[in-house]
Amino acid sequence: MALSTFKREHIKKNLRNDEYDLVIIGGGITGAGIALDASERGMKVALVEMQDFAQGTSSRSTKLVHGGLRYLKQFQIGVVAETGKERAIVYENGPHVTTPEWMLLPMHKGGTFGKFSTSIGLGMYDRLAGVKKSERKKMLSKKETLAKEPLVKKEGLKGGGYYVEYRTDDARLTIEVMKRAAEKGAEIINYTKSEHFTYDKNQQVNGVNVIDKLTNENYTIKAKKVVNAAGPWVDDVRSGDYARNNKKLRLTKGVHVVIDQSKFPLGQAVYFDTEKDGRMIFAIPREGKAYVGTTDTFYDNIKSSPLTTQEDRDYLIDAINYMFPSVNVTDEDIESTWAGIRPLIYEEGKDPSEISRKDEIWEGKSGLLTIAGGKLTGYRHMAQDIVDLVSKRLKKDYGLTFSPCNTKGLAISGGDVGGSKNFDAFVEQKVDVAKGFGIDEDVARRLASKYGSNVDELFNIAQTSQYHDSKLPLEIYVELVYSIQQEMVYKPNDFLVRRSGKMYFNIKDVLDYKDSIIDIMADMLDYSPAQIEAYTEEVEQAIKEAQHGNNQPAVKE
């Protein structure tokens, strides 16, 4: 129970009293990766997140750990090579949260990719990204392309490319990395905001003053080194330090829409051109839905809850109807949406899609380290780079020596399944185990596929007498209780949006079971009447934002 909600007070006591080799500000995938790398090397690590884990960018992506085909188009050869190799590592270390998915790349007359350039491009991609033989590209005829996805626009169709991307659950990837870091000894807590830095007599950062946003308690965490990994908020965090450099972020926004497959019966993931601006976007089937995205526009509005506008929705609806003309989807067919912010490093005069997704480390005179930019796929390598630097500074300043990076072959929480090749057999073995508990085969398969080697703990929860007193289906009940016991869920939206993904991909379950979920959480976490009222309102607001993102108030932070 290293990341249990019930351990919050114990964790806070340690954070108050101990001194850490490294304190990390930010609980998205970048911060989680740094916490795991540093704690695996033997550093004493603390991490604070002002919201819930992955509540910012790391739960709002296109949910792909991809090799960066789009970067080949921009001749960023090094990025393609690195992301391709990292993608394979991410998959191997956590096959329960990352799944290979064949992607169709339709080629139309006048489109981004012609037949020759697609063949050359995908061939280069295979070599640069180190794609395994079974997943290397295939070139398809027009007939073969339509056999893969009959909904694709026939007019001007010349054929298609077929290559493998990796689909992930970004928020669950983040929490599984975080849980493994906690198992390695990192002290990790959410809803804890950094307020300001503390300094020693040489004006070097030696700690962070924080506030617990659930209790309003204020305390200081002592640290030898501090890393700012706050994603879209890195400039806000740096503004409290006297020694910041002149570099800054440029935020861009990406919006996705979710449509039920009864309205958009997509059977195959597709990467395709839009008509309006030549951007390429994804349409991906998932859990009886199809999700489509993303947009790419500059953004300077509220960061904690980015706005989905009617213009964003119209752009994606038009894109769907352009590439899949027979479906004729309308705005009313959108079940839910999400918007995420990309924290990119500012480059003057560049359009949103032209700004590099590279990451950079900035070191201030105060000793504060900031990691900015980057992308989901590269989280492990980004962590390695910055922890290498932290290790170097700790040796120079304190004479401390730590082992080198060891995350390349380190399974994340739930990933102890015998490797990706064994994952399907592992799942079927767990389905057999579940039969002995009387758990439905389909439920058991979904749970084993989602939670990997942690699934036995969910099966055990299914045997408790409390379940029989609840009004929830077994699957939702065990996921909810597990997320409180093992994944530091405190508010209903932590579960509904990020641990389960239901707010995006099964909003009907949210509408049907939200009251029962709040009742169980209130009982387990001893909510006050005021908390019940506040958290119920937060759920209603999240539903409203998912269904009608354009109704959010246009206020600035």
UniProtKB/Swiss-Prot annotation:
Keywords: Cytoplasm, FAD, Flavoprotein, Glycerol metabolism, Oxidoreductase
Cofactors required: FAD
GO biological processes: glycerol catabolic process; glycerol-3-phosphate catabolic process
Subcellular location: Cytoplasm
PANTHER family: ANAEROBIC GLYCEROL-3-PHOSPHATE DEHYDROGENASE SUBUNIT A, GLYCEROL-3-PHOSPHATE DEHYDROGENASE
Intrachain S-S bonds: none
Name this protein carries in UniProt: Aerobic glycerol-3-phosphate dehydrogenase
Reactions this protein catalyses: a quinone + sn-glycerol 3-phosphate = dihydroxyacetone phosphate + a quinol
Superkingdom of this protein's organism: Bacteria
MF term (GO), any: glycerol-3-phosphate dehydrogenase (quinone) activity
Entries under PROSITE patterns matching the protein: FAD_G3PDH_1, FAD_G3PDH_2
